[in-house]
Amino acid sequence: MSIHSLLLSPEDIYIYKKHGVFINHNPESNAYLASGVAPVSSYLQAGLSVTIGTDGAASNDRIDMLAAMRLMSHLQKVTALNVPLSKEMNSWGILRCATNRRIAKSIFILC
């Protein structure tokens, strides 16, 4: 698992995909800390798995998964400068990121 992953190079994306690394995207934390916006749509189109997280209280003033999902959608629209996003970033795509069973299962095994 890779947390945040805001500035991945094409080589990084290749390595992540080759080794099955998935990204945990924390949009509220990234906004709160002014870290930037991860190009989630590009990562999904490249075949990477992306989950949504809320990060911790030190870098986020609330732990609200629905707010994180909503902000992820809005930030991806802003960075794409386009309201209709790809199927990866529509409401169902964002819900899949929030509830990816394969990834959740691997986290449970690691804990």
What is each PLM-predicted segment?
Residues 41-111:
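His/Asp/Glu-enriched, well-ordered alpha-helical/loop segment
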